[in-house]
Regions:
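Short amphipathic alpha-helical surface patches that serve as generic macromolecular interface elements
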Residues: 223-226, 245, 268-271, 438, ...
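Acidic-residue sensor for enzyme active/binding pockets
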Residues: 79, 181, 440
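A generic secondary-structure signal
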Residues: 42, 166, 273, 444-447
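Short glycine-aromatic motifs
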Residues: 162, 214, 224, 269, ...
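Beta-rich carbohydrate-recognition and catalytic domains
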Residues: 1-19, 26-76, 84-157, 169-220, ...
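Structural preference for beta-rich elements and adjacent junctions enriched in aromatics
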Residues: 309-492
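Beta-propeller and closely related beta-sheet repeat lectin domains
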Residues: 21-24, 78-81, 163-166, 225-228, ...
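Residues that act as N-cap/strand-start positions at coil-to-secondary-structure junctions
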Residues: 19, 76, 161, 223, ...
């Protein structure tokens, strides 16, 4: 489906082409899909703003058919992004270049001598896209400016930056967090940084054409381009950007403090985006720029990234019977599995007598060596000690329970531990494709020392390949034998 199709147009009595780029889409609260793309005239982009702008299409049947294309803004722009607020207001953020370039167009300045400037602006709709405010169809092509940063002055023109915007409404707040790319010229080269801005009043007051803002802002935090910002339901924010390679940083619930970058993709390219597909899973995408036999043959790279964090075990009534239907209200889990073909999710729950764990493993080739190890330690212990318990499950159910004795893990009587499993596949049969297994485990609280209502826990996955080699998957960079590194689990 070609949603926005390039087509021939006439500009100043000469042939030209309408071109589209940077489409963004979202599912609105009423179920419609809204898609918005930047458009421009191919030959006259820097001659007139009349044929530059934002185009919108809406589908009311899940994308099977689309309504007519509507122009919702005119003026030079790039990279629209859609955000809908809880009250239904739709905001379109975009790189705002029209007002600064318009006087230069009117003066007939050649494109090679023009001084472009950017910044981020928005237009709003409160009726699902029927009308827009401001409704900009003529000079000076000024929308509602929300962020711009002074870069330099050239030919008497103040040049601003802050572009490629991506905004979110932070969970359970009235604060909008906005990530942008900021571009400067250093020694004749473009240098790009990542900037964030914030608004607690829904950008109530717009900026003037030569005004910096907003006041609440973190400018030029790291080198990078094309940022994208998302937030998990549990509060953690995640910020991606491009620095030839796709970078991701995990942030706090206010999108102000971010950790070190990770590099989930191995190719180099440009642009990029993030999208949540589950409560703990975010998908990153980026163009993979490559040449094959001297020809440019770009591809799209995709990475699935899983969030692991502190979990509060919910109170639940669990029957240990190998069936996960009791776990509908216990959805938080630790996820492990990136180096092998297998993946596992482990969910906790609790009652007054036991802690419960549901291990769900996806595995297309089951063998006896395909185990998941669950480690439990007292929250007051930074090192392995006699309060550290290790449970091992596999396609045959619970296969081991051991306690650290000061030098190694020694098996203990597992009689008080309940376990039940469901197998989806055949063990050791290379001729079929398996699905995996499910194991429920109930651990008596009497086997655990729990300080400050909290444990530390860790998961390790082992996958035995058809060649007999075993691959170990761990939780990121967590050390399996250092409880101080493990994830907190609140159980009281």
């Amino acid at each position: 489906l070609k949603l926005f199709n390039a087509h021939n147009i006439t500009v100043f009595d000469s042939s030209d082409k309408m071109c589209y780029s940077s489409c963004d889409a979202t599912v609105l609260q009423n179920g419609d899909i809204m898609a918005i793309a930047s458009f421009r005239s191919g030959r006259n982009f820097r001659v007139t703003n009349e044929f530059n702008g934002l185009a919108m299409k809406i589908s009311s049947d899940g994308g099977r058919t689309w309504g007519v294309e509507q122009i919702i803004y005119k003026g030079s722009n790039w990279e629209p992004q859609i955000l809908q607020l809880p009250d239904g207001e739709i905001q379109v953020y975009f790189t705002h270049g029209g007002p600064k370039i318009q006087p230069q167009m009117e003066a007939g300045i050649p494109e090679s001598e023009m001084v472009p400037s950017s910044g981020t602006a928005i237009i709003r709709s409160k009726d699902n896209g029927k009308t827009w405010d401001p409704y900009v169809m003529e000079p000076p092509y000024a929308a509602h400016r929300v962020s711009q940063q002074y870069a330099y002055t050239k030919k008497g023109i103040q040049v601003f930056t802050d572009q490629m915007p991506c905004a979110i409404l932070l969970n359970n707040t009235d604060t909008i967090a906005l990530a942008m790319e900021s571009m400067f010229v250093r020694d004749g080269e473009d240098v790009l940084y990542i900037t964030t801005a914030y608004s607690d009043d829904n950008w109530a007051v717009g900026l003037g054409i030569d005004e910096e803002g907003p006041a609440d802002k973190q400018e030029n935090m790291w080198h990078g381009a094309a940022p994208y910002l998302r937030q998990f339901p549990s509060g953690e924010t995640v910020l991606s950007y491009n620095q030839k390679r796709f970078q991701i940083r995990l942030g706090d619930s206010l999108a102000r403090e971010f950790g070190d970058p990770i590099d989930p993709m191995h190719g180099t390219g440009f642009w990029g985006s993030l999208e949540l597909i589950q409560s703990h899973i975010v998908v990153g995408t980026m163009t993979y720029a490559r040449k094959v036999s001297g020809q440019q043959q770009n591809r799209i790279m995709i990475s699935q990234n899983v969030l692991n964090h502190r979990i509060d075990a919910p109170r639940a009534r669990i029957r240990v019977d190998g069936d996960n239907t009791d776990w509908d209200d216990a959805t938080d889990a630790l996820f492990v599995g990136s180096d092998s073909q297998a993946q596992a999710a482990v969910r906790p729950a609790k009652d007054d007598d036991n802690l419960y764990f549901l291990v769900e493993r996806l595995d297309t080739d089951l063998s006896d060596g395909d185990t998941v190890e669950l480690y439990l330690a007292d929250s007051g212990s930074d090192t392995l000690d006699t309060n550290t318990l290790r449970l091992t499950v596999g396609p045959n159910g619970l296969t081991g329970a051991a306690r650290f004795n000061g030098s190694d893990f020694a098996e203990i009587d597992a009689g008080g531990i309940q376990a039940a499993m469901t197998l989806q596949g055949t063990i050791g049969n290379d001729e079929d494709e398996d699905t995996g297994y499910l194991v429920e485990v109930a651990v008596p609280r009497s086997l655990l020392r729990i300080s400050n209502q909290q444990l530390r826990w860790n998961v390790l996955l082992r996958d035995r390949g058809t060649d007999g080699r075993v691959t170990e998957d761990i939780l990121g960079t967590i050390r399996w034998n250092v409880p101080g590194d493990w994830m907190p689990l609140t159980v009281d």
